[in-house]
């Protein structure tokens, strides 16, 4: 198959074709340097300017105030599960977690290694298909931060509201939803996101952190590579940053502006998700486990009423150029991820295939 396919994978996800073509054209000789972007030193004026431009573009998109730091860190977003409690918890503090899916469960268990974490809600017994009722929780007096995952990539669950914390810093894993919908940065103490959904390719983690959270470092001293304050003071250049990822991210930020900004993409994302859910709800052949009020816009989880047909389904979808529809190994079933770069044409092609498969096998 020579033509581009529709990649419904949860990550790495589709990137806009125009960005890939730009990167291809610039790959051997970036900005007339005679070098590839992969070869240029990270402390050269060109790369320092690239990082500065990327940060400024992200600040404009999200309206990030000056009292927040933007960090471009190498590695998986999962590292933040440990970095957050290490940086934000003092002796005697505790962290409160909403456990609404696999990723928040993992984050809680990582924080609990310090024996300083508790959960406000745990939706695992119900199968991670719903969100806790609004404001039905109580924080301990020694709570240093509240942690939640607005969009659970694996389980397809989305918070329809931002938890109120009474002034306690709110920490959010926005790996699969940052830049897909408008947010108010001032509601958060810290936001982080892996890049491989809506930002760039895998290997970059973006952290947005309020300056107040950098002022009180817990004892003992945090290792330098895991210290937010250290990375902020060095403007993401304490160690070699993932330059190529930042390069693609910078292009993505500018692309988002051409799409009507985050608000424009959010409207499009809502339409894409609504169209797919509407079809899935119209037939008994496909099952959707998540309660309607908690459905994700980015990650639509579903299954077949005849599970033994799943391998056939995936094979035929793959032959049609509909890739990576298999659900996560921890959740099973099927999943269609509709990130920013997924066009409506991809959703239409998927619905057409779903309809045909149901008619032929129902």
UniProtKB/Swiss-Prot annotation:
Q: Which GO terms describe its molecular function?
A: O-phospho-L-serine:2-oxoglutarate aminotransferase activity; pyridoxal phosphate binding
- Please tell me where pyridoxal 5'-phosphate binds in this chain: 77-78, 103, 153, 173, 196
Please cite one Gene Ontology biological process associated with this protein.
Answer: L-serine biosynthetic process
Q: How is the cofactor bound?
A: Binds 1 pyridoxal phosphate per subunit.
**One Pfam family cited in the UniProt record for this chain:** Aminotran_5
Q: Which residues bind L-glutamate?
A: 43
Amino-acid biosynthesis: is it a keyword of this entry? yes
Quaternary structure annotation from Swiss-Prot or TrEMBL: Homodimer.
Protein name, as recorded? Phosphoserine aminotransferase
Q: Which organism is it from?
A: Legionella pneumophila (strain Corby)
Name of the gene encoding the protein in the UniProt record: serC
């Amino acid at each position: 198959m020579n033509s581009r396919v529709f990649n419904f994978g949860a990550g790495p996800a589709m990137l806009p074709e125009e960005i890939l073509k730009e990167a291809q054209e610039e790959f051997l000789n970036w900005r007339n340097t005679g070098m590839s972007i992969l070869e240029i030193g990270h402390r050269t004026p060109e790369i320092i300017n690239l990082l500065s431009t990327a940060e400024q573009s992200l600040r404009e998109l999200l309206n990030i105030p000056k009292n927040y730091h933007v960090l471009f860190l190498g590695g998986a977003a999962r590292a933040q599960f440990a970095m957050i409690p290490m940086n934000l918890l003092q002796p005697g503090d505790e962290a409160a977690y909403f456990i609404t899916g696999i990723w928040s469960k993992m984050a809680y268990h990582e924080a609990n290694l310090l024996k300083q974490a508790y959960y406000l809600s745990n939706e695992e017994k119900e199968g991670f298909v719903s969100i806790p009722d609004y404001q039905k929780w109580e924080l301990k007096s020694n709570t240093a931060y509240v942690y939640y995952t607005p969009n659970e990539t694996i389980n397809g669950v989305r918070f329809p509201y931002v938890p109120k914390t009474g002034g306690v810093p709110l920490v959010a894993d926005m790996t699969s939803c940052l830049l897909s919908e408008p947010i108010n940065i001032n509601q958060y103490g810290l936001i982080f996101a892996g890049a491989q959904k809506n930002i760039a390719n895998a290997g970059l983690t973006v952290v947005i952190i309020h300056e107040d959270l950098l002022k009180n470092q817990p004892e003992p001293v945090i290792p330098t590579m895991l210290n937010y304050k250290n990375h902020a003071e060095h403007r993401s250049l304490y160690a070699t940053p993932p330059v190529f990822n930042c390069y693609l991210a910078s292009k993505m930020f500018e692309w988002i502006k051409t799409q009507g900004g985050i608000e424009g993409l959010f409207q499009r994302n809502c339409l894409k998700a609504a169209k797919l859910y509407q079809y899935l709800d119209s037939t008994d052949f496909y099952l959707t486990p998540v309660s309607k009020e908690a459905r994700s816009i980015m990650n639509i989880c579903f299954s077949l009423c005849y599970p033994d047909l799943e391998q056939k389904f995936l094979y035929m979808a793959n032959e049609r150029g509909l890739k990576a529809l298999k659900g996560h190994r921890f959740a099973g079933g099927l999943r269609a991820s509709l990130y920013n770069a997924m066009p409506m044409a991809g959703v239409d092609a998927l619905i057409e295939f779903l309809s045909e498969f149901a008619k032929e096998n129902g």
